[in-house]
Amino acid sequence: MKDILYRLFEHQYLGRDEARTILQNIAEGKYNDSQIASLITVYLMRNISVEELAGFREALLEMRVPVDLSEFKPIDIVGTGGDGKNTFNISTASCFVVAGAGYNVVKHGNYGATSVSGASNVMEQHGVKFTADIDRLRRSMESCHIAYLHAPLFNPALKAVASIRKSLGVRSFFNMLGPLVNPVMPTYQLLGVYNLPLLRLYSYTYQESRTRFAVVHSLDGYDEISLTAEFKVAMPEKEKLYTPCLLYTSPSPRD
C-alpha cells in the first residue's frame, strides 16, 4: 500500500485492475486503518477517475452476497449523502411513499458516516431487523412492497471501513460507491448525487449496465430534487435541466 499511496500523492491515477485489487485487499484486512484513511483522503483532494470508480465498483460487486429478487423488478431510491445540507433522510422516506403506491422497492443502505442518521439508523429505530435471509426479504417484498438490505451484511469491504468512515466524519469515495453496488442489481434506480461532476460520472458508469436509471442533482447543492433551485436529471437517453415549477404543473409530452 505504501507504494500506491506515494503514487497517489504525486497525482497519479490507478488503473481499473489496481483499484479492484485495492478494494479486495481492504476486504481481506491487508491494510491498517491509517493506510485506509490516507486512501480516503486522496479522493478528498481530487476527483476520482472513471477507471478508478469502475475498478472499485467491480471489486465490491464481485465480493457481494448476491440476492435474487429479479421477479419483483424492483426500484432502488438512494442518495450519496455528503452534500452537507443536514436534511432528513429524504430518499429513505421516498422509498416508503413509492412502496405505498404499490411499486416494489429494494433499498440498500448503511449507517450514517457523514451525518447523524443514515438509512440503516432510520430503519433500526423503526424496529427493522436486518437480515441477509432471502426468504425473509421475499416475504417483506410480497407483504409490504419493500425490502431493506443493510450494506455491511452483503459486502465485507463496506463492513471493514465502517468505523474508519465514521471516525473521519467526511464524505469519501465510499459515498459514491454505495449506490452503485446494490447486491440485488435492481431493474430501476433513482440516484441523487452531491455535485455535477459526479452526476456525469454516474451516468457514464451506468451506460455499461442494464439498469434503467435517473441521476439527479440540484444546483443549490442537494443530492435530491430541490424545491428551491433548478435540478439536473441524467437518464440513458438524455440529460436535462428542470425547474421546481414543473413539479406543480402538468409536464409536456416531451418531459
Language-model features and meaning:
Residues 136-192:
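Phosphate/diphosphate-binding glycine-rich loops and adjacent basic-rich segments that engage nucleotide
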Residues 187-230:
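Glycine-rich ThDP/TPP pyrophosphate-binding loop and its adjacent helix/strand module
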